[in-house]
């Protein structure tokens, strides 16, 4: 019997229960009927951040960035490419620290870009500085292996 996982919809923020064997079969949200995974990241505000980090039973990788940050803009395409490789085993999201400065303060973000990996509502790993897509994928997979995530 397969495990049922809670996966928060990036469109309507409703928590869905998905059998683990169906994660790779392009599941749709039971509420809004949009795809739960679309091989790209999505933006979070404070309320959606808390839902995704606390309710998703798959690890959530968050890119803390700012619009004025050159390295953040350089890393953005790499983060999107990493999303296409890491979903559905990981959920990738972005937080604009200028628009949602309360989250930057809450997580003591002092340098951007900063990647933070969350599992079970808590931060389990952090990496600061721009990275290429292969480096992001390797880092996430190494963190998952070291911490037995996912």
Located regions from the model:
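Short cysteine-rich clusters marking metal-coordination/redox-active sites
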Residues: 9-12, 29-32
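Cys/His-rich microdomains that often coordinate metals
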Residues: 16, 36, 76
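Short linker/helix segments within small regulatory modules
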Residues: 18-27
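Short Cys/His-rich micro-motifs in 6-15 aa windows
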Residues: 32-41
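A short beta-strand-turn-helix
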Residues: 41-60
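Short pre-active-site segment immediately N-terminal to redox-active cysteine/selenocysteine motifs
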Residues: 57, 64-68, 111
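Typically the conserved alpha-helix immediately C-terminal to a functionally engaged Cys/Sec
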Residues: 71-86
